Regions:
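Active-site/ligand-binding neighborhood in enzyme catalytic cores
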Residues: 1-103, 108
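Residues forming the flavin
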Residues: 63-66, 72-76, 90-96, 101, ...
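A short coil-to-beta-strand element that immediately follows conserved catalytic motifs
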Residues: 87, 238-258
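A conserved FAD-binding loop/helix module that cradles the flavin
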Residues: 291-313, 317
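N-terminal mitochondrial targeting presequence
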Residues: 400-403
């Protein structure tokens, strides 16, 4: 885990062509970053799964959109078994008891939620912002300072004709594009024999991930223009002036979904800081793909992290022994002994309206960007094409962060 993919290659004398033919596309697909930034552990873990699991190489798509085809059936199952799912509820803070256990959750609307057990499944950057101050002094939670989510952009493109495609997820070595698929072929809900709907991942999209441009700070139109230019280079016979008809496929509409902090950046040396699902807080458990488990920061990792969190809660409820806390690295223990509160990202409030506050991907409007500035101004350091008011707000947010 201490070596990047490129460092690993050089150490063991692997030719550069392997990087160009294999690792660039793997790195961008697995963690949305370039191989010189990615821990080799991520690639080896993925290859191990591919080779040792019966269906390890198979790719699967939902047959429709995620809220309806995945989330709604889960919600119905919970409600059928007596549970309740509350939507669009914003947490203001976790209120603690004297022993630092959770007393209740205070919602933005003033409601108080009491429970025997509490589980957090938010992204690591959101967890860092919401972490109660007494917990920030604990070595267990200080591990989170070593983990940082990276930005990613998903782009949806609707064309006026059917493009040549394969019924599969495609991996790219493009400097801008990561993975893509023609959803009109791969997904039942979007099936269309006449027109293509391409979904792709735009990555790396910031210097954090190895990119040269902070695309999160660019306008949606700038991102779409760059994407179309790259697609024209990759598919000259279908898109652009080199197509047989001299025009190529016409873009009918588009959607740009930005996730300012997505999966944690699996850069070298980070894996040892992923915390266990069990925490030092007796009634609080962590879930999420960034917690310690065999998979990467991914949907698979999120599912497994949730399963392990459920096992912790279930074992405690039955009075059974749990797996216990993961050993904390020595450097974290040493730092915790002299912790002064510096370096912990904590915005003034957490009840803002925009979904990006809680780690969601979103089609950002200007008001969403201004809320993003409050919690993560580094994401919007380049504001070409934005209003002067927005630029001024960025500068003010950065100043407030450094004061």
């Amino acid at each position: 885990d201490e070596l990047s993919v490129t460092d690993f290659m050089r150490k063991y004398g692997m030719p550069e062509r392997i990087n160009e033919e294999v690792f660039i596309s793997m790195a961008k697909a697995l963690d949305f970053i370039d191989p010189d930034k990615l821990s080799m552990t991520v690639v080896l873990t993925a290859m191990n799964r591919f080779l040792n699991e019966t269906d390890g190489l198979q790719m699967a798509f939902l047959d429709g959109n995620q809220p309806d085809r995945l989330c709604e059936p889960m919600k119905q199952s919970i409600e059928k078994n007596g549970g309740k799912v509350l939507m669009k509820q914003r947490v203001k803070e976790w209120v603690l008891n004297e022993d630092d256990s959770v007393k209740h959750i205070l919602m933005a609307n003033g409601e108080v939620i009491e429970a025997d057990e509490f589980i957090s499944a938010v992204p690591v950057d959101v967890m860092k912002r919401m972490c109660p101050e007494p917990w920030t002094k604990m070595p267990f939670f200080q591990q989170m300072k070593q983990l940082e989510g990276i930005p990613v952009i998903n782009i949806h493109l609707w064309f006026d004709r059917k493009l040549q495609n394969v019924d599969h997820l495609c991996f790219s070595r493009s400097p801008l594009l990561s993975v893509y698929a023609d959803m009109s072929t791969t997904c039942k809900e979007y099936y269309d024999e006449e027109k293509s709907m391409i979904e792709l991942v735009f990555a790396p999209c910031s210097p954090i991930a190895g990119g040269k441009t902070n695309w999160i700070a660019k306008s949606n139109q700038e991102i779409v223009d760059a994407t179309m230019k790259e697609l024209e280079r990759l598919f000259p016979l279908e898109i652009g002036k080199k197509a047989p008809d001299g025009v190529g496929a016409k873009l009918l509409k588009h959607a740009v979904v930005k996730t300012p902090r997505s999966v944690y950046a699996a850069v070298p040396g980070r894996n040892k800081y992923r915390p266990s699902q069990e925490t030092p807080i007796k009634n609080f458990t962590l879930a999420g793909d960034w917690t310690s488990q065999k998979f990467l920061g991914s949907m698979e990792g999120a599912v497994l992290g949730g399963k392990l969190a459920a096992e912790v809660v279930s074992a405690k409820a039955k009075g059974m022994k749990t797996a216990g806390l993961k050993k904390i690295n020595d450097d974290i223990m040493a730092e915790a002994s002299t912790f002064s509160g510096q370096g912990w990202k904590r915005p003034q409030k957490m009840e803002d309206e925009s979904p990006v506050v809680f780690g969601a991907g979103y089609v950002l409007e200007e008001n969403d960007e201004q809320q993003l500035m409050t919690i993560d101004p580094e994401q919007l350091t380049e504001m070409d094409g934005r209003s002067q008011a927005t630029k001024d707000a960025v500068q003010e947010a950065v100043l407030n962060r450094t004061r």
